[in-house]
Amino acid sequence: MLTTESPTTTTTTTTTTTSSPSSDIRDKFIFGNLEVKVKEVKGCQLHFLNVKCELALKKTEIKTKPLANHTFFDVFSFRVSAATSELEIEAWKKNFLFKDKMTGSLTIPINDLLHANGEAKWYPLSNKKPRSSRVKKENITNSNNKDNNTASPSSPDEAQEKGDEDQHHSADESPAEETSPTTGRPRSVSMPAKKVKAAPEICLEIKFVLNEPPKEVLKGIVLDGVWNSENNFGSLINNPHWIKCTQYLLSIKDEITPITLKLRQPEGTDQRCSFFVINYDPFYNGSKKVILDTTNDIKKVSSFNSPIPATSVDCKIDLEPGQYCIIPYAESFAFSGTYKFNLDSEKLDNCEFYALPKSQEQAWNEITVDGLWTTATNGGGDINILGWTKNPQYSFTLTKKSRACVLLSQDDNDKSVGFYVIKQLDAGKRAIEFREQVGKTESFKFSCSTGCTLTLDEGTYIVIPSTYDHGIEGAFHLTLFTDDKNATFQPLTNAFQEVEQVKGTWVGKSAGGSPNQPTFFNNPQFHLKVPASDKDEVIAVQLIQDSTIADEGIGFIVLSRDSHSEPLTAQDFQNEMVFTKTSNWEKRNDIVCRLHVKPESPREFTIIPSTFDPSVNRSFKLQVYSDVSISLDEIEQKDESSDSEQNDD
């Protein structure tokens, strides 16, 4: 009866390190005590163990014999204070003639230490890598020759012997083979299975007690703040939304004061942050600052515009007497979180620190309008060329004397932009004359935002934004900040309904000069006719000289007389005929005078434009603006030859 014997199976249990759940320990302070109990070592010959953590090194008792298995009763305590700490254990075998030999090692990372709870646990000890033995050159040569001879059998018998060698080990290599005395052929011998050696391991009890990190005590003035989508727009340089960031006012009273500013976030907040220290003008008087020029406004801090962003920021700076605006920011746009802002100084009595605005009454009335430049509506920024009147215009009305700041912003900085602010001269109408400028940007520049501050009386004003070059298309935003809670700001689209234009020339005799010259009445003359009405009418008369350098003074007078069929002469002129005139003869491209025509006023007028000096040859245009139908024609000069013939008769 045949029986089948099952092969014997040997099972080896190997303990491996179980990876603990990963903890995000970045930017955390770790303070705690680590207790390590060494209980037992298996499969590793040693005399003693070295246990290291950070800079501390401790040694177990030294065993008398280097047995593979040892029991220990050592307990070690370590201070853990760094996010890169780890526990290192080394097994050493003493050598009384040579250096001691390390027979095993173990490294436990910080994450495993943080989750250790004092339970006994087996950890594998890694064996020290054996040194590679040197092979003599002749052995390598003999081995190569043997391999060559074996690889190429020259006869069938050798091939057969080669096949036998592939199936069986040589007697020198394996004790499981034996040579038969009769045939000389090897035969198999049953041998017991070789026992697998267990991996070396160590049993440890590790307990980690996490201590609360020492609390930072902020001295001086501490202000609490909140970041959210409404007040955090990242780094504010070249950002048109900077005005919405939280601002603090720091006042240094009467001497240079060294201060320390600290920006702190809650523990564990992984958000880089920083702040700017910016000059604060007395103009703002407790209101938030409208930053117009970061180049000149930002105080340099250690050659940086702001302290280097980090999860917490410290800054030491000496400040002269004055006021400074401090703007904290989180690096991620619209980040939500809390923070503390701390000011400390040896001269704290010389400092004042609070959030802006100082009171609700000092909060800005903020009004924003959106606009668009097109090829047809962008006349450029040169006010000496009448194309500027094509630009968009916006009017704001102040109900009292007020502070105002106008900010022009664009979504990028690829266009050179700026604006002018002038007083509105024609109620409810777009400006036709560049006069009574009250403010402007310092220059046209490639920037995301630019603006100016103003202190203005009650009234209506016009903002004229433009690019430096005409015809460029693009979107823009205009924002008015004012302490007048009843102020209004809106696009200005209304214009005069009627515009009449005639062209003329000053040349030769017709270039008669100003009224101070006896030849004044030789200048071209024009007949303006206004229809009868029971309402007051405002008629704007504009004289434009065809010159871009405005090198000649120009002006005109408006006369009322009985007949306008012929040019007025010096002999017929009377002072009572003067209805109005330009205030002066000015060197400018255009000049405007307004006629206030009442129901009882004359309705027909003679207009005589001129240069200031006589004999100046130049062409010109005369334009009349009105909301009623008007007529404007040149009065023909008398034919002098006909007059002389009539006199001869």
Curated annotation (Swiss-Prot):
Residues 140-149 have a biased composition (Low complexity). One of its GO terms (cellular component) is cytosol. GO terms for biological process: proteolysis. Residues 1-22, 124-193 are annotated as: Disordered. One of its GO terms (molecular function) is calcium-dependent cysteine-type endopeptidase activity. Signal peptide: none annotated. InterPro entries: C2_dom, C2_domain_sf, Calpain_cysteine_protease, Calpain_domain_III, Calpain_III, Calpain_III_sf. The record marks P192, A193 as: Cleavage. Residues 458-489 are annotated as: Domain III 1. Its EC number is 3.4.22.-. Keywords: Autocatalytic cleavage, Cytoplasm, Hydrolase, Protease, Repeat, Thiol protease. Residues 159-172 have a biased composition (Basic and acidic residues). Residues 15-123 form the C2 domain. It holds the Pfam family Calpain_III. Residues 1-3 form a propeptide. SMART domains: calpain_III. Its main location: cytoplasm. It is found in: Cytoplasm, Cytosol. Residues 498-633 are annotated as: Domain III 2. Monomer. Belongs to the peptidase C2 family. PANTHER family: CALPAIN (PTHR10183), CALPAIN-5 (PTHR10183:SF379). Has a weak caseinolytic activity. This is Putative calpain-like cysteine protease A. It comes from Dictyostelium discoideum.
